[in-house]
Amino acid sequence: MVMQEEKKRQQPVTRRVRSFSESFKNLFRPPRSRDSSPINVTRIPYRSSSTSPKRSSEPPRRSTVSAQILDPKNSPIRQRSYTLKCCTPGLSHPFRQTGSGASNSPTRHRSISGEEQEIVNSLPEYKRSASHTFHGIRRPRSRSSSVSSCDSSNGTTSSSDSQWAMDSLLDDSDNDLTPYRGSNKDILKSKDRAPYNYIDDYNKKALRRATSYPNPLPSKQFYNERLYTRRSHPDEESLESLPRFAGADVQCIIEQNGFKVYEDGSHEHNIKLSGVIAKLEKGNSLPAHRQGSLSRPRLGITLSGLFKHHKNECDIENALSLLPNVEKSQTNHEKRTGQSPNDSNRSSPTQGREDYLKIVNPDASLGSDELKLINSLSSRIHKSLQNYLQEKNLKPAECIGEQAPTFQDNYGHPVGLVGAGAYGEVKLCARLRNEKDSPPFETYHDSKYIYYAVKELKPKPDSDLEKFCTKITSEFIIGHSLSHYHKNGKKPAPNILNVFDILEDSSSFIEVMEFCPAGDLYGMLVGKSKLKGRLHPLEADCFMKQLLHGVKFMHDHGIAHCDLKPENILFYPHGLLKICDFGTSSVFQTAWERRVHAQKGIIGSEPYVAPEEFVDGEYYDPRLIDCWSCGVVYITMILGHYLWKVASREKDMSYDEFYKEMQRKNQFRVFEELKHVNSELATNRKIALYRIFQWEPRKRISVGKLLDMQWMKSTNCCLIYDST
């Protein structure tokens, strides 16, 4: 008996591989840091497929996979066999191809043909080994799978086409996929199709992986629209040169009003399209319109009262751009290449002058080029307004002596109403796509049309001419410089609304912007409140992280928004957030300044205004009021209503209660009662909220430091940003 027990102790203990459910004790734990962390990416919003087989709790330790490889030149199908070797959990899995050198392999062997030997001889030395071992890097599993041709008798999967190696393995420790990153780089130069999805079948005691490809690669426009993932690789291989990987299904564990959370912690947004664009996409053609008019679209819906024609309405048929031709051509070139065409040869416009100012802040959005554009636009707007006030029906200055493209040539015609502002309405315009249009598209589009948001700016009879001119110029310059920022090779932020052009007509000015088809955050919250619902905390966290990154981009380039509120936050259906309306933005630092300019006075909408703005004569940092506004926006998303109407103890009892509780208990009841999916996220969020809602500006956290807090670091966002 003693001898038997001694033998049992000496025998190695066989550890069972952890099952999928055991690997995720905490579904929403913070992601592990990895050397190959993705930058500037958008997670692929794959949908869960109900057709994929379910896996049992224990995967097999060894499996054989057979793949049919079809030579495009010769019709016979050759059969290859592969061996999957299971490794220690946490390490990358080797994937061995059996051949003449793999004598110990349990799978059957096949001699290499003469044609294949020529291919092997043409490869570099490091690729000629008879038994190839492929190692990979981790990559998240996708949420869709397609069924390949499977042989259930021997646990193999067959697929067709040539030179495709096995692309991934399943890591037993955490069910991450380890994709192959080897010779695919050379293969993909001559291939334009992606492999089949890979299917697991743990119930059959075999791990089946096969490759084939009728699925085309996603077009470049999806990558540029940030619908697909961009990841950094050691060999500088972009995702556009790699096949889209589709692995095992991931189960959806939370679904609330179109928002889905999956068991790997990722999520998917499904925001409804606005009513105007939903109507247009159902029809086969654009609605009829009066030629050149911005005011009488026919949508087939009850909007006739909004589009009654008036004598003073804006006809934009002859509206022309106010941007100088040189500036516009350089802007178009910068959109494509990221640099100015004459950067190497062009000298500074002020070179040689004794009073030339040295640029000390090259990252500032407002530099010498923007200053020249401001002067040019101001003079043209002043001249046009003088002609308008004197009732001189003159053509725009740009149309004299040159054949410039009109508004209708570049942006089409109006098809609907989006909203209204202080100085005019915002309309939706659409233009047919043509051969010159190629990805990336910087605004919403479908298979036939490209859509633009057009804001009509017209002075009121009693408005101050100088103030109106300043507002138009500053709003366009700030939005244009932020959305087309290409200095020092840097790309614009994905969370800033693109501003394309400003045009003038005989009686008004027209600003052309990017169109976001899912509407604004205010409309989203109103719609949910009618259904007695609210945003899920994980969805609100994702929106908050995007908002903070957009605001940080503005602050890094010397601009504070100063009017952050749900009405100025727009969305795409897949959850991409855009910050808009820079009419009240403040330039606190230019390219020639080192210090930050403080400001005073109330700016913005009262529920989102920081308390220091209500102090008469007090100067404050505009960056800190943006941080306060972001906090109010987040609480509004979570609660579905304001915390208070005004952040002033004298004017609002709710704010006074918040102030007293913080003074007496050093905590606020509303923040303490907020729930999240787990206690860790709830605690981290609560700590961040207390840092945001500090009524003393010197104690308030900045946007950059807020992004470095554990709450935001552990938040899964639709976009993964560059840490630099």
From Swiss-Prot:
Highest taxon of the lineage: Eukaryota
GO molecular function: ATP binding; protein serine kinase activity; protein serine/threonine kinase activity
Region (Disordered): 1-81, 93-188, 329-355
Binding-site residues, ATP: V418, G419, A420, G421, A422, Y423, G424, E425, V426, K455
SMART domains: S_TKc
Subcellular location: Cytoplasm
Low complexity bias locations: 45-54, 143-162
Gene Ontology biological-process annotations: intracellular monoatomic cation homeostasis
Keywords in alphabetical order: ATP-binding, Cytoplasm, Kinase, Nucleotide-binding, Phosphoprotein, Serine/threonine-protein kinase, Transferase
Pfam families, A to Z: Pkinase
Catalytically driven reaction(s): L-seryl-[protein] + ATP = O-phospho-L-seryl-[protein] + ADP + H(+); L-threonyl-[protein] + ATP = O-phospho-L-threonyl-[protein] + ADP + H(+)
Composition skew (Polar residues), residue ranges: 95-106, 338-351
PROSITE patterns: PROTEIN_KINASE_DOM (PS50011), PROTEIN_KINASE_ST (PS00108)
InterPro entries, A to Z: Kinase-like_dom_sf (IPR011009), Prot_kinase_dom (IPR000719), Ser/Thr_kinase_AS (IPR008271)
EC number(s) from the headed UniProt entry: 2.7.11.1
Any one GO cellular component localisation term in the record: cytoplasm
Residue numbers annotated as active site: D563
Annotated positions of the Phosphoserine modification: S19, S232, S238, S241
Limits of the Protein kinase domain: 412-712
Misc. remarks from the entry: Present with 981 molecules/cell in log phase SD medium.
Annotated family: Belongs to the protein kinase superfamily. CAMK Ser/Thr protein kinase family. NPR/HAL subfamily. HAL5 sub-subfamily.
Name of the featured protein: Probable serine/threonine-protein kinase KKQ8
Organism for this UniProt entry: Saccharomyces cerevisiae (strain ATCC 204508 / S288c) (Baker's yeast)
